[in-house]
Amino acid sequence: MNKYKNKYNTDNKFNNSKYIKNNQVELSKQELEDEEILKINDDEFNEGLNKQALFQQDDYVYKFKKQQKEEKIGGDEKTQIDNEKPEDFNITLKSIDFKSINLPSFKKRFLQSSTIKDIDSFEFINSTTEFIIENKSDDDNYYDDDDDDEGDKNKEKEKEKEKEKEKEKEKEKEKEKEKEKEKEKEKNKEIENKTYPNNCKIPIANTGESECLPNTLKLFFKKTQFPTPTLFQQYAWPAILTGHDIIGTSLPGSGKTLGYLAPMIPHCLARVDRGGKNKITGEKAPKQYTGILVLVLVPTRELGLQVHSNTLIITQLFGIKTSVIYGGISKNLQIEQLEKEKPQILISTPGRLIEMIENGHVDLSSVTMLVLDEADKMLSKGLIPQLKQIRGQIRPDSQNILFSATFPDSLKEVSKDWIKDPSIRLRIGSSELPKLNHIQQDAQLIAHHKKPRALIKLLSEPQFKEKKKTIVFFNKIKELKRISIMLLKSNIKHDTIFGNIDQELREKLINKFSSSRSTLLLSTDIIGRGIHIDDIFNIINYDFPRSLEQYCHRVGRAGRSDKVVNPKAFSFLTNSDSYLVEPFVQFLKDQHQNISIPFLKLCNENFGTKFEFTLSKRKQKKLAQKDDVEKDDEAYLAKYEKLIKKDRKKDSDDECKKFKSFKRKNIDSDSDNDSDSNSDNGKETKSKDKNKKFKKY
């Protein structure tokens, strides 16, 4: 057990006074080369380390390492900012005073529909049926009249009578048409009530050719041969095109990325200067750069690269330029890229963006649309200071879009700083946790030191040997490396990805995994959010995540396309996860998952939970038979014990009676022998021997 114990405890050598002097750390070369000491954890804000000393230790080591890098670089160029660590930099940006600036107006509304009611907020839940409104035009009937015969008056009278009859028929037809129109109006009202949910007058884009969408979006969907939009996209596109701020939540793989990328097309085209022809000279005017119009903030580098790859088709079709910047690679290359491309859409992680703003390479004063992808992660405590600095660089009337798979109620107050009324809250599915019914989920309660063997046994099952893509998630890099060595010794080929490795290698590993050149990947939460790989069949939580929201993000990586049949998720839980057992089991029940009875029994025994479960008929019969046998055995044992007790009592009573009678006789014989001093010695020895037999009584 000692070898599995975490070596980072309160007695760690970094807490010794000889290693800490004047808030500085003195480390040997071997300690600096040891990655396991320098990099403790890669999960969300080091939540896995509960003791404050460990946070201080990590901070001291990082500062020392940072000083060494600055000395090597020479101090002219600042060190790179890792966007995943909020404590990696100390930059304070001055917010722009937009009140003193005459801000140019911009078009927000691109929805081809009636205006929205003036109320504080809207909330869309669930789905509606597809309805198409058809406007029928009234056709006028024309009749040809014969030429009048002046000499034949009778014919004229007959014609007049025929005309009167025709007029009567026309009147009857008109009445029938009016009745049909009234019926159609009633039908249209019913359709409008269903097409515009909750009386909000925001339609649903059932197809890419819906009337509510602008022509630029229709052209985009036509050229890309876009299939039927997902349920989330049907609601999200019209909602964003209204120009209002929006919070959107839906399960992983529901098309949230394209849900906010598509409305950017009309938003940018309305402000991009295309350099049209001069009316007088007929010459083409040079294009003028309008600045960054849309900013997309993402929590991880991998998600930023994925979003950027989805914007390339927009650049090809409409000439809207996009760029992505993130930490982990050279800033000079990104600066050259920004100066060359001059993007209208910028995708970035918070840390690198703040550094670029401070150095004067990025100006956000022209941004009119702000997107927070994975908003629940972005609005967590560690990143809020960075986001507030970025928000101070953007005009206050910008349209803000917050999308995520989960958005707990605890973040509603925080989101008020980013959402202006009237706002729209779009929710498809559960209020906090998405539905993952399409994924078969199972769990096992196990001791921590038994998890490695259990993982190897699990990976040796047929479903994992078929070379189906599998991701194994860890909370700590140290544990990931240890398990990786064990798997290599067991001849199980795999790749590993975590925060320590270079960005180029991380990109290569993701491309290798997505192209099926490798099928087993060990990872931290670095790819637990937003990364879209179509054909992932299995998810294994070697370390159970520290929240159910993160569990949904991890498990949601599987089964994101029709190619994947029967995706599965398996989780190991230990005693340290006891605080999540009850909500996790309730979540599985809400998902209609078959929870194993041994798992529930162990939870009841170890954690004192009171989970109820029903056994199958076969198991019930077996248990009933066992109970009957046990009852019979207990009855036989009880009877046997009673008989033994009775026999013991009888034996003891008989012996006591014999002893008492013998004792009386012996006393009488002794009294008679007192007068007779010359008694036989043989008789005395016999009486002594008899007395010895009854001494035990």
UniProtKB/Swiss-Prot annotation:
Protein name: Probable ATP-dependent RNA helicase ddx5
Domain of life: Eukaryota
GO biological process: one example: nuclear-transcribed mRNA catabolic process, nonsense-mediated decay
E.C. number(s) listed in UniProt: 3.6.4.13
Enzyme kind, highest EC tier: hydrolase
Single GO MF annotation: ATP binding
The family this protein is said to belong to: Belongs to the DEAD box helicase family. DDX5/DBP2 subfamily.
Composition skew (Acidic residues), residue ranges: 140-151
Composition skew (Basic and acidic residues), residue ranges: 152-190
Family annotation (SUPFAM superfamilies): P-loop containing nucleoside triphosphate hydrolases
Catalysis: reaction(s): ATP + H2O = ADP + phosphate + H(+)
Residue span of motif DEAD box: 373-376
Subcellular location as annotated: Cytoplasm; Nucleus
PROSITE patterns tied to this protein: DEAD_ATP_HELICASE, HELICASE_ATP_BIND_1, HELICASE_CTER
Domain Helicase ATP-binding: 237-425
